[in-house]
Amino acid sequence: MPVVYVNIFLAFIVSLMGLLVYRSHLMSSLLCLEGMMLSLFVMLTVTVLNNHFTLANMAPIILLVFAACEAALGLSLLVMVSNTYGTDYVQNLNLLQC
């Protein structure tokens, strides 16, 4: 396994560990999720470019679109929770009953 793949995989693992450790604040969780999506995007792009997958050229762009949608929804939820309760604790998400 080349060094580039190992570094990207380690970036994914560090982001995953950050998500598991810093799960009390919503902003920390969102930043760790963005790190995971960024490492997945780079891994998918490097894989497509190295293996010359012509049918999978759009896959990194589609993943980037999903990451942008996830970020927009996460930030809107962060704004709603912080305006309602004054903090960005993940525990406050249990109080949001529709």
From Swiss-Prot:
Catalyzed reactions: a ubiquinone + NADH + 5 H(+)(in) = a ubiquinol + NAD(+) + 4 H(+)(out)
Family: Belongs to the complex I subunit 4L family.
Keyword Zinc-finger included in the entry's annotation: no
Protein name in UniProt: NADH-ubiquinone oxidoreductase chain 4L
Top-level taxon in the UniProt lineage: Eukaryota
Spans through the membrane: 1-21, 29-49, 61-81
GO cellular component terms, semicolon-separated: mitochondrial inner membrane; respiratory chain complex I
